[in-house]
From Swiss-Prot:
Changing E21K: In allele mago-93D; expression of rolled/MAPK in developing eye and wing tissue is severely reduced, and photoreceptor differentiation is impaired. GO terms for biological process: import into nucleus; maintenance of pole plasm mRNA location; microtubule cytoskeleton organization; mRNA splicing, via spliceosome; mRNA transport; oocyte microtubule cytoskeleton organization; oocyte microtubule cytoskeleton polarization; oogenesis. One of its GO terms (molecular function) is RNA binding. Keywords: Cytoplasm, Developmental protein, mRNA processing, mRNA splicing, mRNA transport, Nucleus, RNA-binding, Transport. Signal peptide: none annotated. This is Protein mago nashi. Heterodimer with tsu/RBM8A. Part of the mRNA splicing-dependent exon junction complex (EJC) complex; the core complex contains btz/CASC3, eIF4AIII, mago and tsu/RBM8A. Interacts with Pym (via N-terminus); the interaction is direct. Interacts with eIF4AIII. GO terms for cellular component: catalytic step 2 spliceosome; cytoplasm; exon-exon junction complex; NLS-dependent protein nuclear import complex; nucleus; pole plasm; precatalytic spliceosome. Core component of the splicing-dependent multiprotein exon junction complex (EJC) deposited at splice junctions on mRNAs. Involved in exon definition of genes containing long introns, including the rolled/MAPK gene. The mago-tsu heterodimer interacts with the EJC key regulator Pym leading to EJC disassembly in the cytoplasm. Has a role in oskar mRNA localization to the posterior pole of the developing oocyte, and may also be involved in polarization of the oocyte microtubule cytoskeleton.
């Protein structure tokens, strides 16, 4: 698989007491990782980071997504976005393009109570894996001090 046929974007956020708070990241076909985290809690400011990742990271992302089987899911039976918040996941791999929108999921209890627990569980675990990978990449890229 070449990098030209891959794109991923994830967003989770809500508008509440502290304004529009959100986490968003995307991987572009050229390997650029864009990350934004906005929290107005205690007057925090928006954190924006950009970095380029190696081709092997892009290949691993594709593998994670393909192994998750998320491309076969449908968000129609999932809970719609509400006052608690919304999640969006957009993925392009080759000529396949999917876009999911659902409410924020606090835990597996929320997943199990949904109309499609199997599909939403697939989404839930994939999002956890993606967030873990992105937090690690951002942390490594911006916090490692040279010896």
């Amino acid at each position: 698989m070449s990098t030209e046929d891959f794109y991923l974007r994830y967003y989770v956020g809500h508008k509440g007491k502290f304004g529009h708070e959100f986490l968003e990241f995307e991987f572009r076909p050229d390997g650029k990782l864009r990350y934004a985290n906005n929290s107005n809690y205690k007057n925090d400011t928006m954190i924006r980071k950009e970095a380029f990742v190696h081709q092997s990271v892009m290949e691993e992302l594709k593998r994670i997504i393909i192994d998750s089987e998320i491309m076969q899911e449908d968000d129609l039976p999932w809970p719609p976005p509400d006052r608690v918040g919304r999640q969006e996941l957009e993925i392009v791999i080759g000529d396949e393009h999917i876009s999911f929108t659902t409410s924020k999921t606090g835990s597996l209890v929320d997943v199990n109570r949904s109309k499609d627990p199997e599909g939403l569980r697939c989404f839930y675990y994939l999002v956890q894996d993606l967030k873990c990978l992105v937090f690690s990449l951002i942390g490594l890229h911006f916090k490692i001090k040279p010896i």
